[in-house]
């Protein structure tokens, strides 16, 4: 596995660096001395470094450089212009025409109409000195190497283009990265049963043992007693903490903040100029594209919770329908007796006929803004937990039959719409080891299959609740309950047939809860191991994320070996809370949901752009909970070129129509004045981001969708203009090339 060679000096984080990282963390989460270290600005017009400090810093550095050997400065003479070298893919028909006097060359593509490019000449150090520019480039280069390492170890996605630049910087040949891609279950063939069990693999006979919060795999029990695990790439906590401390220090460095802030401003301004020059040409491309428009290009709801995947009217209609059909059916059990549906409503002093969407009270309103606790109460129809247990739970007296029926109806609506897909989340809490068997029995028993749905597992971060009630002895037990059954079903599928079939339909894991809840714990080498975490306090976000990633990494290696589908780590991140959440996600998450707090860190925002980390944004959800719609950074991120998609989060709480995803697109298009090309680009991003199979993506996006840039875009399927794809790709390569040029100057 081609991991990356960092110098000894770069690899070892000295005591001063670790101390600085801890100080930065303390100022971020405890508000010590303000929050300016990591979070330099909230409004993008404010420069992260004050003008006086920056002028003094540059003056000092220039004076310092004058007294040094002038060879380095001479190397920069004549380097005022940069020639953009776009790495060529094997299937690309791109040819580059070299233009000496311009920063970026103008590539010509066979499938891209001529369009007007923005070209800028002059110095490109973006407000920092030559010496600082070299430091910035080294830091950004190492940050990208860190992400690439963790993505490849866990069979998650890292784009080809940055890999090519990183290998060019290393002076190494690019290894085909397709072998590191995740594997998703292809759709069943016509007439094939999606719940078939005949092809389950045989038992491997491996032995499993959790050690330090991570499940280790042994060939047999004898090897386990000798502590000789199979040679999988197990996680190294010390390396992770060193990388984390490096990133903490990087995002707090003044020159890095200034450079990235100015590059982001440039990206935003450049896109606006591009739109002024080429908007009509993009529209002309779309008008000449037959049988394809925004309505019939594929779009995926990349972030939606199964328990709220229906709108409030749908839920109300189902409650009334179930009462009409099953009034005398026993549906609920209390300690005293079993209740029919009629008796249950009588006990609640209500009649379904009298219910309205207002009395159902599941919609988020003004009262939920900045009140996540009140938002969670909205999952209880009419404020009654009994109705939530009956209609929105998988484990109840009727074995989740009503919930399964609602989900099937939502799936049927998606099939009718044809071009909309969803990735609902089902919950595993880690309270007991039999949760997986119950959930898989519910899924397979009710035959919950929809060609327009793929599934994910969400793990709520509520260890503190379980520990306070003495359900769990320590955090390690929670991790064991979450992951051990999945390992066992992977090793011996025939003894866990339902779970093995269920796992074929799962594409990833999510980590969910209120991010604004303060932990106060900094994950470090001094942190207790999961087996030693017996206190009632909840571990930090980073602690949760690392141990989820670590187990997913080992699990993916095992499943890849067996020819099974693998899983992505796709947590909620950046909706609220500290910026360390986003820093952790940059290291180990395939993609994230929300990402609002990226607007507070230019360094992380720029890194998310360089690595093209997908972000599922939900402006309507944010509008009810954390951020007013007009202040949502969605448009800003789109203009800069971050890979964003639109999602609904919880249609039951936030939406009104039968097609909540179209409602999300419609409102965003009106508020942000999006063009058709903008919306189709976001829709294409959602398909790339999601966990549907390679075969389906090739059908929806084109056979070359794995290629980046216009070569990988089939306008006949995506309705995204080739001019837009060429602009995005050239701009991305230009920013990566700046880093490469900055590192060349240090040689």
Curated annotation (Swiss-Prot):
Phosphotyrosine (modified residue): where?
Answer: 216
Q: Which residues bind Zn(2+)?
A: 303, 305, 572, 649
Q: Which GO terms describe its molecular function?
A: AMP deaminase activity; identical protein binding; metal ion binding; myosin heavy chain binding
Where do the annotations place substrate binding?
Answer: 305, 374-379, 575, 650-653
The UniProt entry, under Pfam families, shows: AMP_deaminase
Q: Show the InterPro entries listed in the entry.
A: A/AMP_deam_AS, AMPD, Metal_Hydrolase
| Residues carrying Phosphothreonine | 81
Could you confirm whether the keyword Metal-binding appears in this record?
yes
UniProt record, GO biological process: AMP metabolic process; GMP salvage; IMP biosynthetic process; IMP salvage; response to ATP
Q: Where are the transmembrane segments?
A: none
Pathway, per Swiss-Prot/TrEMBL?
A: Purine metabolism; IMP biosynthesis via salvage pathway; IMP from AMP: step 1/1
Task: Give the first-level EC class, as a single word.
Answer: hydrolase
Q: What is the effect of changing residue 425 to H?
A: Loss of AMP deaminase activity
Q: Which residues carry this modification: Phosphoserine?
A: 85, 441
Tell me which domain of life the UniProt entry assigns to the organism this sequence originates from.
Eukaryota
Q: What is its EC number?
A: 3.5.4.6
The alphabetized UniProt keywords are:
Hydrolase, Metal-binding, Nucleotide metabolism, Phosphoprotein, Zinc
Which proteins does it associate with, and in what oligomeric form?
Answer: Homotetramer.
**Protein name per UniProt:** AMP deaminase 1
């Amino acid at each position: 596995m081609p991991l990356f060679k960092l110098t000894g000096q770069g690899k070892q984080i000295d005591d001063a660096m670790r101390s600085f990282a801890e100080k930065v963390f303390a100022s971020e989460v405890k508000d010590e001395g303000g929050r300016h270290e990591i979070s330099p600005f909230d409004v993008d017009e404010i420069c992260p470094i004050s003008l006086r400090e920056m002028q003094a810093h540059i003056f000092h550095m220039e004076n310092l450089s004058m007294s040094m050997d002038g060879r380095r400065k001479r190397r920069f003479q004549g380097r005022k212009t940069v020639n953009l070298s776009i790495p060529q893919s094997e299937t690309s028909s791109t040819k580059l025409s070299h233009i000496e006097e311009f920063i970026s060359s103008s590539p010509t593509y066979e499938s891209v109409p001529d369009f007007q490019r923005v070209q800028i000449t002059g110095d490109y150090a973006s407000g920092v000195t030559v010496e600082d520019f070299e430091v910035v480039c080294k830091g950004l280069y190492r940050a990208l190497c860190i992400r690439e390492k963790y993505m490849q170890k866990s069979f998650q996605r890292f784009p080809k283009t940055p890999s090519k630049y990183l290998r060019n910087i290393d002076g190494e040949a690019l290894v085909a990265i397709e072998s590191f891609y995740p594997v998703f279950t292809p759709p069943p063939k016509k007439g094939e049963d999606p719940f078939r069990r005949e092809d389950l693999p045989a038992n491997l006979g491996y032995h499993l043992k959790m050690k330090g919060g991570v499940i280790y795999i042994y060939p047999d029990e004898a090897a386990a007693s000798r502590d000789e695990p199979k040679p999988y790439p197990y996680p190294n906590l010390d390396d992770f903490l060193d990388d984390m401390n490096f990133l903490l220090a990087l995002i707090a460095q003044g020159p890095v903040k200034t450079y990235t802030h100015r590059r982001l401003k440039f990206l935003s301004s450049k896109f606006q100029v591009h739109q002024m020059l080429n908007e009509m040409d993009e529209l002309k491309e779309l008008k000449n594209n037959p049988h394809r428009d925004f309505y019939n290009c594929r779009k995926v709801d990349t972030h939606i919770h199964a328990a709220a995947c229906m709108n409030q009217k749908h839920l109300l209609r189902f409650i009334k329908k179930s009462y009409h059909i099953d009034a005398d059916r026993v549906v609920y059990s209390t300690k005293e007796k079993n209740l029919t549906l009629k008796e249950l409503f009588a006990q609640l002093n209500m009649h379904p006929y009298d219910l309205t969407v207002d009395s159902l009270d599941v919609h988020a309103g003004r009262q939920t803004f900045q009140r996540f606790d009140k938002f969670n109460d909205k999952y209880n129809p009419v404020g009654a937990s009994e109705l939530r247990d009956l209609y929105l739970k998988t484990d109840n007296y009727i074995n989740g039959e009503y919930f399964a029926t609602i989900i099937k109806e939502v799936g049927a609506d998606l099939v009718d719409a044809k071009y909309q897909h969803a990735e609902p989340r089902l919950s595993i809490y880690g309270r007991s080891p039999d949760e997986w068997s119950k959930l898989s029995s519910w899924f397979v028993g009710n035959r919950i299959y929809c060609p327009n749905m793929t599934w994910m597992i969400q793990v709520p971060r509520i260890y503190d609740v379980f520990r306070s009630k003495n359900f769990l002895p320590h955090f390690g037990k929670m991790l064991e309950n979450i992951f051990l059954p999945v390992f066992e079903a992977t090793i011996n599928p025939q003894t866990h047939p339902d779970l093995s079939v269920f796992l074929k339909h799962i594409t990833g894991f999510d980590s969910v809860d209120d991010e604004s809840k303060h932990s106060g714990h900094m994950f470090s080498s001094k942190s207790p191991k999961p087996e030693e975490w017996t206190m009632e306090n909840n571990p930090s976000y980073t602690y949760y994320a690392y141990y989820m990633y670590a187990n997913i990494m080992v699990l993916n290696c095992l499943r890849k070996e067996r020819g099974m589908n693998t899983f992505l780590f796709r947590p909620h991140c950046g909706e609220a809370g500290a910026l360390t959440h986003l820093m952790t996600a940059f290291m180990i998450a395939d993609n994230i949901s929300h990402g609002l707090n990226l607007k507070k860190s230019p360094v992380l925002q720029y890194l998310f752009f360089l690595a093209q980390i997908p972000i599922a944004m939900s402006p309507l959800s944010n509008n009810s909970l954390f951020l007013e719609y007009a202040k949502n950074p969605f448009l800003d991120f789109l203009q800069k070129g971050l890979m964003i998609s639109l999602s609904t989060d919880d249609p039951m709480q936030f939406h009104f129509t039968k097609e909540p995803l179209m409602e999300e697109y419609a409102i965003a298009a009106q508020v942000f004045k999006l063009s058709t090309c903008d919306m189709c680009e976001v829709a294409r991003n959602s398909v790339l981001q999601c966990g549907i199979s390679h075969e389906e993506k090739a059908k929806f996006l084109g056979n070359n969708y794995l290629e980046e840039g216009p070569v990988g875009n089939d306008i006949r399927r995506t309705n995204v203009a080739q001019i837009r794809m060429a602009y995005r790709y050239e701009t991305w390569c230009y920013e990566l090339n700046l880093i490469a040029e900055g590192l060349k100057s240090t040689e």
